[in-house]
Design a protein with these regions (language model features):
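Arg/Lys-rich amphipathic alpha helix in sigma70-family domain 2
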Residues: 50, 62-82, 100
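Internal acidic/polar
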Residues: 77-109, 131
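Residues within helix-turn-helix
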Residues: 31, 133, 144
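A short pre-motif secondary-structure segment
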Residues: 121-125
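A short, charge-rich alpha-helical start-of-domain segment used by transcription regulators
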Residues: 1-21, 25, 31-34, 50
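DNA-recognition helix of helix-turn-helix
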Residues: 139-162
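Structural recognition of an alpha-helix C-terminal capping motif at a helix-to-coil junction
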Residues: 35-42, 46, 53-65
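Short helix-coil-helix linker/hinge
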Residues: 101, 111-119
């Protein structure tokens, strides 16, 4: 990979607003979104991108991959914490915790319950306004996969909101 060209830097700057919306959509939290956006820009500036890469597509892909890395890390930390609590004889989750979790799930938007793959694709198409072909390029997946994920996401949302 090479450092960014002047054109790629300009394109990246043009994508900041969309990247911010995408980050908020992925994280569901403005603080996490700010952190994710900062990490994305840092990574793109530090690591660069192929000379022929489109800055927008590349930056969305970097953003999504960083978020997936964060989700994996959180999962590992959560499992580790639960294992430690179980080792100390603590049951781990009380009834109050369970009720709070249920209330939280009810309050969450229908988007947040979608699988990450479906949510990312749907957000890029519906919120960011990218075409299926553009999303396929951003996420480096076949266009048919984009189409099926969008369809499944829409069906899931319809079921959830019915």
């Amino acid at each position: 990979m090479t450092k960014l060209t002047a054109r790629q830097k300009a394109d990246l700057m043009e994508e900041l607003t969309g990247l911010k919306r995408f980050s908020v959509s992925l994280t569901g939290d403005s603080h996490d979104a700010d952190d994710l956006l900062q990490l994305t820009i840092e990574r793109v500036l530090e690591k660069g991108m192929p000379a022929d890469a489109h800055a927008g597509k590349w930056s969305y892909r970097v953003c999504r991959n960083l978020w997936l890395d964060e989700l994996r890390a959180r999962d590992v930390r959560t499992r580790h914490a639960k294992a430690e609590m179980a080792g100390n004889g603590d049951l781990g989750v009380s009834t109050a915790d369970g009720l709070s979790r249920l209330e939280f799930e009810r309050a969450s938007s229908a988007l947040s319950v979608l699988p990450e793959e479906q949510r990312s694709v749907l957000l890029l198409v519906a919120v960011e306004g990218h075409s299926y072909a553009e999303v396929a390029g951003i996420l480096d997946i076949p266009i048919g996969t984009v189409m099926s994920r969008v369809a499944r996401a829409r069906r899931s949302l319809a079921d959830k909101l019915a």
